[in-house]
Amino acid sequence: MIAVVFRYDVRDSETFEEAYGPVGEWAKFFRDGTGFIGTELLRDVEEPDRYIVIDRWESIDAYNVFISEHQKEYLERSDESRLFYLQELRFGTFENVWVD
């Protein structure tokens, strides 16, 4: 399992949560992908306009295939989504090394 992790500083929390949450437009888009597990949305308790988004996939290959096959739509959605945030930082793609 891998996790693709982003941090966002947002303009409007409610709008951002609707778009990026587990039932939001991004998660709906990813659900079409083989190997997509789900999205987790975390809000910073000390800075409530800061969020972490974690998209989980069965493998890096599943993620890369989806992005490759849907690159045009992914880029279009990314451009449209810029209205929701002030800053986006991609932390990286992480794999589980220990599961309890």
What kind of feature is each model-predicted range?
Residues 2-9, 38-68:
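Short, well-ordered beta-strand segments in beta-rich or mixed alpha/beta enzyme
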Residues 14-16, 61-63, 99:
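Residue-level signal for secondary-structure boundary sites
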Residues 2, 38-49, 75-100:
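Glycine-rich beta-strand-turn "strand-cap" elements at beta-sheet edges
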Residues 13-38, 73-79:
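Short amphipathic alpha-helical segments
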